[in-house]
């Protein structure tokens, strides 16, 4: 029989204890846990170093309230890792005559990069995308083609550059110069593309805010799939989707959802007739819409965390390019049908148009005021009114000025008497000593200086009265300007109408629909839903 040779690894395996025979740790959870793998221990102690990178660059994680409320035990040494010898003071003295170790001297030397001026070294890091990598023949490409830039280093540099850029606009003068530079850059003619030098512009058009449609709030609605009906396609489907409406609804259990309504055949004919006759709607007609789909929604607006500004452009031939704001972003996902819950597949939306009420017109004027500046004519009228008020109040100021002069003369008399008393005190202090003389003289000078600079109590009261009058005049001018702007808003009423409405009053998922849904809607129509 041939001898059996046992290696060192086999010997060690034979003496190892069987690790998977140990009993698992008893869990403190009553229910059965599907994944019972315990987390590993932290390999090192906390370092208390600020993390300069964005925490959401790899994955967006939101901690729960249970994690936020948990307090981790921080176990540290009593001396915090710093051992101090309080008995022998010579422990921390450094001998200047001691020579460093050669290894330490190399660590203190500055790294000098060798110049890479040779042509061969410049070609090492060159990457040719259209050429096949010869991995089986040579590893030269793999050795020289690897980039030396690490992502952490690149991100750190970008963070540092971001901090330096933010410091540029801290000063007021730098902000003014930066704003003026934008006007100068806008005057320069565009001769070529900013990144493609061979691309030249065919037509240059100015970009302005959309003053016509800015009064209507717009929302971006994103569907998870094509909402077009299955039985139609092409131009007919696009025509139906252009006339579609979305409304917030509630099922029997009280769960809210978004209903997607498409126009019926009769409504499509009425809309086509309105378009041919160049009118928005017929006042007495009723437009019917049938429910097509049900969605759950997720809304983000300006009040939501992580909101990003979004704009869209409108090209008008012969006029220019205009941009408008998308202040709400809505994501719609298909709603699953629940067993035992009656679906609203037979719901019918009946729409009848009306004129806008005062509240809706005020909301439009408020949005319009975001873009428009005050007209110079109104400013001149305000200035004339303020001048008339100042002229009318000048007589009262003169009377108050004469009374303040009388009070000032009385204050001067009292000041002279106080000076005499101070002189008597100075004579008495001369007898007491030289140090007391100097202190009393300083106090007398301080009192006189205070009276000359700040005046008496009567003067301060007159100043307070005059300040109150100035504030009253300023308030009056503000009220006049507000009334003038309101009148202008009523004169410039807009009869434009939008066919979209928003049932999304808040930024959270499945938020409760309240009266704010009508305020957020830009539609000038009344909608009633009936279920068969």
Curated annotation (Swiss-Prot):
Biased composition (Basic and acidic residues): 361-374, 389-434, 442-453
Coiled-coil ranges (or none): 352-401
Compartments it resides in: Nucleus
GO CC terms in record: Cdc73/Paf1 complex; cytoplasm; fibrillar center; membrane
Gene Ontology annotations of biological process type: cellular response to lipopolysaccharide; endodermal cell fate commitment; mRNA 3'-end processing; negative regulation of myeloid cell differentiation; negative regulation of transcription by RNA polymerase II; positive regulation of cell cycle G1/S phase transition; positive regulation of transcription by RNA polymerase II; protein localization to nucleus
Residue positions where Phosphoserine is found in the record: 117, 456
Keyword annotations from UniProtKB, A to Z: Coiled coil, Isopeptide bond, Nucleus, Phosphoprotein, Transcription, Transcription regulation, Ubl conjugation, Wnt signaling pathway
Domain of life: Eukaryota
Comp. bias regions, Acidic residues: 375-388, 458-469
Positions of the UniProt region annotated as Disordered: 1-23, 361-532
Compositional bias of kind Low complexity: 499-508
Crosslink site: Glycyl lysine isopeptide (Lys-Gly) (interchain with G-Cter in SUMO2): 133, 154
Pfam short name (any one): Paf1
Entries under InterPro entries matching the protein: RNA_pol_II-assoc_Paf1
GO molecular function terms noted in the UniProt entry: chromatin binding; RNA polymerase II complex binding
Task performed by this protein: Component of the PAF1 complex (PAF1C) which has multiple functions during transcription by RNA polymerase II and is implicated in regulation of development and maintenance of embryonic stem cell pluripotency. PAF1C associates with RNA polymerase II through interaction with POLR2A CTD non-phosphorylated and 'Ser-2'- and 'Ser-5'-phosphorylated forms and is involved in transcriptional elongation, acting both independently and synergistically with TCEA1 and in cooperation with the DSIF complex and HTATSF1. PAF1C is required for transcription of Hox and Wnt target genes.
Family listed: Belongs to the PAF1 family.
UniProt subunit comment: Component of the PAF1 complex, which consists of CDC73, PAF1, LEO1, CTR9, RTF1 and SKIC8. The PAF1 complex interacts with PHF5A. Interacts with POLR2A, TCEA1, SKIC3, KMT2A/MLL1, SUPT5H, RNF20 and RNF40. Interacts with UBE2E1.
Name by which UniProt lists this protein: RNA polymerase II-associated factor 1 homolog
Native species: Bos taurus
Taxonomy of the source species: Eukaryota, Metazoa, Chordata, Craniata, Vertebrata
Gene (UniProt): PAF1
């Amino acid at each position: 029989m041939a001898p059996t040779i046992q290696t060192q690894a086999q010997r060690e395996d034979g003496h190892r204890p069987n690790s998977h025979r140990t009993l698992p740790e008893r869990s403190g959870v009553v229910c059965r846990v599907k994944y019972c793998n315990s987390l590993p221990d932290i390999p090192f102690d906390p370092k208390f170093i600020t993390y300069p990178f964005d925490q959401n660059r790899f994955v967006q994680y939101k901690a729960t309230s249970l994690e936020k409320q948990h307090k981790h035990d921080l176990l540290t040494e009593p001396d915090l890792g710093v051992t101090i010898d309080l008995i022998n003071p010579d422990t921390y003295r450094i001998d200047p005559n001691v020579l460093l170790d050669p290894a330490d001297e190399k660590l203190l030397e500055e790294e000098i990069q060798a110049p890479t001026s040779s042509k061969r070294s410049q070609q090492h890091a060159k990457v040719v995308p259209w050429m096949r990598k010869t991995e089986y023949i040579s590893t030269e490409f793999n050795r020289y083609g690897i980039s030396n830039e690490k992502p952490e280093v690149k991100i750190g540099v970008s963070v540092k550059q971001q901090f330096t850029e933010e410091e540029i606009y801290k000063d007021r003068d730098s902000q003014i110069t930066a704003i003026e530079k934008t006007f100068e850059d806008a005057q320069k003619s565009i001769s070529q593309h900013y990144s493609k030098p061979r691309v030249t512009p065919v037509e240059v058009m100015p970009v302005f805010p959309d003053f016509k449609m800015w009064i209507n709030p717009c929302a971006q609605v994103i569907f998870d799939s094509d909402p077009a009906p299955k039985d139609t396609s092409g131009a007919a489907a696009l025509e139906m989707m252009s006339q579609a409406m979305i409304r917030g609804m509630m099922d029997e259990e009280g769960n809210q959802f978004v209903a997607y309504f498409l126009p019926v055949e009769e409504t499509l004919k009425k809309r086509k007739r309105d378009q041919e006759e160049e009118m928005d709607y017929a006042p007495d007609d009723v437009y019917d819409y049938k429910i097509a789909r049900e969605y759950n929604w997720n809304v983000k607006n300006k009040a939501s965390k992580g909101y990003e500004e979004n704009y869209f452009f409108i090209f008008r031939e012969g006029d220019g390019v205009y941009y408008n704001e998308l202040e709400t972003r809505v994501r719609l996902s298909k709603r699953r049908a629940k067993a035992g819950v009656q679906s609203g597949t037979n719901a019918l939306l009946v729409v009848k148009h009306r004129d806008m009420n005062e509240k809706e017109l005020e909301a439009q004027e408020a949005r319009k005021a975001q873009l428009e500046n005050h007209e110079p004519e109104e400013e001149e009228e305000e200035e004339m009114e303020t001048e008339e008020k100042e002229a009318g109040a000048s007589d009262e100021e003169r009377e108050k000025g004469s009374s303040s002069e009388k009070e000032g003369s009385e204050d001067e008399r009292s000041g002279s008497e106080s000076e005499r008393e101070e002189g008597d005190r100075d004579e008495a202090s001369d007898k007491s000593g030289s140090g007391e003389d100097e202190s009393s003289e300083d106090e007398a000078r301080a009192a006189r200086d205070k009276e000359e600079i700040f005046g008496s109590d009567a003067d301060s009261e007159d100043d307070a009265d005059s300040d109150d009058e100035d504030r009253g005049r300023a308030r009056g001018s503000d009220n006049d300007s507000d009334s003038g702007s309101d009148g202008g808003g009523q004169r410039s009423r807009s009869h434009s109408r939008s066919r979209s409405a928003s049932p999304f009053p808040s930024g959270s998922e499945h938020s409760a629909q309240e009266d704010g849904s009508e305020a957020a809607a830009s539609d000038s129509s009344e909608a009633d839903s009936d279920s068969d």
